[in-house]
From Swiss-Prot:
Organism placement in taxonomy: Bacteria, Bacillati, Bacillota, Bacilli, Lactobacillales
Entry keyword DNA-binding: yes
Domain Tyr recombinase: residue ranges: 93-253
Domain Core-binding (CB): 8-81
Record's protein name: Tyrosine recombinase XerD-like
Function statement: Putative tyrosine recombinase. Not involved in the cutting and rejoining of the recombining DNA molecules on dif(SL) site.
Similarity annotation: Belongs to the 'phage' integrase family. XerD-like subfamily.
Chief place of localization: cytoplasm
Active site: 157, 218, 250
Record bears the keyword Secreted: no
């Protein structure tokens, strides 16, 4: 059996395996994602050698992610054995190794961003830090996209829309600047991205954080969501991404 046909056969088994599980669609997506990664690592067979190769690749991930992937793979291996697809029962070690000493991305103290003077720079910073929005998305936001009573923001990106939870300091700031005449764009009129980047740069500089960029703020949003326990698929949805592939580096050790 060729590697491609072997992987195709196991991919079919993944579908059958997940069909037996009474779990949410998002959990099934996570299982499918982890198991397809596992199958793609196999050199045309399941044995101790191929499992060792896979376990070596797992070392790149954080212990919490390793634990999730190990659990999913072990359940799948047991399923294959019980179905008679494997003549021998294989199992990955349940214990993840200690995290490496590699430099990790850090969550910064950005409390000063909440204390600065109100204006477009502060508003943009909080939209990025609390909701992970892109500057281009902020520029297109309209008051009609925001429901302060229900605490939600609807963000349109192409033909898709996502609804994000709005609370904390950003919600308070929007309450403070909204009035009976508030309509149209949040920033009152159309501006360029270059203009908004300058507003952000000026504001963070005034808060003593001159090295912090819009990209860094979005990265901080990602790290804070991961710290809360947000999974890769849910985080991708919050950010408006089509897949969690670009987020994998944040879930690695």
């Amino acid at each position: 059996m060729t590697i491609s046909s072997f992987q195709k056969q196991l991919t079919t088994q993944i579908t059958n395996f997940l069909a037996r599980k009474t779990i949410s669609d998002s959990s099934k997506q996570a299982y499918a994602y982890d198991l397809k990664q596992f199958v793609n690592c196999l050199p045309g067979r399941v044995d101790q050698t191929s499992l060792k190769l896979y376990e070596n690749q797992l070392k790149e991930w954080k212990p919490s992610v390793q634990k999730r992937k190990r659990s999913a793979v072990n359940q799948f291996l047991l399923y294959l054995y019980q179905k008679g697809e494997l003549e021998e029962f294989f199992k990955l070690s349940e214990t993840a190794p200690l995290p490496s000493q590699q430099e990790e991305l850090e969550i910064f103290d950005l409390s000063s961003l909440y204390e600065g003077q109100e204006g477009p720079g502060k508003l943009a910073c909080l939209f990025i830090l609390e909701l992970g929005l892109l500057p281009s998305e902020i520029l297109e936001l309209k008051w009609e996209d925001i429901d302060l009573d229900f605490g939600v923001v609807t963000v349109a990106k192409g033909s898709t829309k996502r609804v994000l939870r709005l609370d904390g300091a950003l919600k308070e700031l929007l309450f403070g600047i909204k009035n009976d005449n508030s309509q149209g764009l949040i920033l009152s009129k159309a501006f360029t991205r270059q203009w908004l980047y300058k507003q952000i740069q000026s504001y963070v500089g005034g808060c003593g954080l001159s090295g912090v960029t819009a990209q860094a703020l979005r990265q901080q949003y990602i790290l804070r969501q991961i710290e809360k326990g947000t999974g890769a698929f849910e985080l991708a949805r919050l950010l408006g991404l089509k897949s969690p592939v670009t987020l994998e580096k944040y879930y690695k050790t």
